[in-house]
């Protein structure tokens, strides 16, 4: 498991999240195995206590003999003048750089099976384990659901299986089957996602060829990456050429998130097949503790389901459809 974590000033980081974040991260590593995880953190230009807290985390990783690279630095002022997605793409690629430079063949002769990205969110180790086991662990990409006080947060990146946008208000999707899946907290096939925490089959980010894993259970819908030839390149007329390993990038034809473009490039490489991108609607992360408690606990109380019914079928659907579907 390769953990890639990125912190940077422009994302309004709250250093108050870092102690909980570090505890959850360390417990996750203990559960998975210290010798099976590589942690990469890239932090830049923070003006709060983040650098100090990251040094404490680094010391603890060293004490536990966990392979890691924590880079806390000040970036050139010119970087702040870059277009936002160009800047974020650069920073994400910096977080991935140790994956190629330090551990290109994995740890102790074992190739990595997953690349896990965790934003600056409140999360529990059980959420990581559940995400990695989405659909029996058979996926190209799997995502949690990230929340802010009103509801679902990452509407800019998430697209349903029909390429439609979603809304922040529960149950998020326009398609009836997808809405029912959210109501029953089941995984949902989507076109793209990120959502605070996302896991990839590591082969999407690997520059080393290796065969499909025998440990993956047989599924009717296998991860596309299991059978893609190497090397492979797509040179569409509309976009920049894409190849493996994936790189975060900008788009020259639309204003899209670097996170969404990663899913798009998976589609381009897999065409005419469809990559197995799954939203695990049962898994909650949030950007502050009160919101996390609200959606992880209070909104799961049985009495709240009456509010869900009244909101979905009467307020959201029948009265304010235009506004709630924006």
Q: What would you call each of these model-derived segments?
A:
Residues 241-245, 272-296:
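Active-site donor/metal-binding and catalytic loop motifs
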Residues 49-112:
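Active-site-proximal specificity loops/subdomain of glycosyltransferases
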Residues 2-9, 13:
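Single conserved hydrophobic/aromatic residue that forms the stacking wall/gate
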């Amino acid at each position: 498991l390769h953990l890639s974590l990125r912190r940077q000033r422009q994302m309004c980081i709250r250093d108050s999240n870092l102690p909980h974040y570090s505890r959850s991260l360390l417990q996750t590593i203990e559960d998975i195995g210290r010798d099976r995880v590589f942690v990469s953190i890239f932090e830049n230009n923070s003006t709060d206590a983040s650098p100090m807290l990251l040094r404490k985390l680094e010391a603890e990783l060293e004490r536990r003999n966990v392979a890691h690279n924590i880079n806390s630095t000040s970036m050139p002022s010119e970087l702040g003048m870059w277009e936002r997605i160009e800047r974020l793409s650069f920073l994400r690629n910096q977080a991935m750089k140790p994956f190629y430079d330090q551990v290109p063949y994995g740890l102790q002769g074992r190739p990595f099976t997953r690349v896990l990205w965790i934003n600056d969110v409140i999360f529990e180790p059980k959420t990581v384990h559940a995400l990695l086991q989405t659909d029996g662990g058979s996926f190209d990409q799997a995502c949690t659901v990230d929340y802010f006080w009103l509801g679902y947060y990452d509407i800019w990146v998430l697209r349903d299986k029909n390429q439609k946008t979603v809304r922040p208000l529960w149950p998020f999707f326009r398609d009836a089957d997808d809405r029912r899946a959210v109501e029953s907290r089941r995984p949902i096939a989507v076109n793209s996602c990120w959502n605070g925490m996302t896991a990839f089959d590591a082969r999407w980010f690997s520059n080393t060829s290796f065969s499909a894993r025998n440990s993956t259970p047989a599924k009717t819908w296998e991860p596309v990456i299991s059978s893609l030839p190497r090397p492979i390149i797509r040179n569409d007329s509309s976009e920049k050429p894409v190849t493996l390993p994936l790189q975060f990038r900008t788009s020259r034809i639309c204003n899209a998130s670097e996170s969404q473009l990663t899913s798009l490039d998976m589609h381009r490489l897999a065409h005419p097949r469809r990559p197995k991108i799954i939203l695990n609607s049962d898994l909650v992360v949030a950007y502050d503790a009160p919101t996390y408690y609200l959606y992880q606990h209070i909104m799961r109380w049985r009495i709240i389901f009456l509010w869900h019914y009244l909101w979905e079928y009467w307020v959201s659907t029948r009265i304010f459809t235009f506004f709630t579907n924006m």
